Amino acid sequence: MKTTSYYPVIMTDDVAATAAFYKSHFRFEAVFSSDWYVHLQSGEQENVALAVLDGTHSTIPAAARGTISGLLLNFEVEDVDGVYDELVAAGLPVLKELCDEDFGQRHFITADPNGVLIDIIKPIPPSEAFAAQYSSSALPT
């Protein structure tokens, strides 16, 4: 199978508010918009996309309808401290404070209006113990 595109789709009971959240706080733009589905593309990075879907829509098998759970969205950014300041000033909840992790991340965790966790990350050099676990092509510097 050759994958030509990959993006998460968040099932929600409020498509408009969820799409507005990602447009407002994460600089996404709607490239398709209906009352039951909005396809969002990053205004800063064309290969970054996200979609929002009415969790009760008929395209979802009946047994799977509802809202999302068990999902963590990771956004890698260049200036995690700046994004932290921006989102805190905008009133977003901080579920994990900004910190450096030995495994090679400076990050914090917030959430969208549906409770979907959002991890904002800046890769940093890992500790020596964790560096040995990376392949040479994936080691943050």
Residue ranges and their predicted role:
Residues 14-15, 78-80:
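Helix N-cap motif at beta-to-alpha junctions
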Residues 18-23, 87, 115:
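Conserved active-site tyrosine of GNAT-family acetyltransferases
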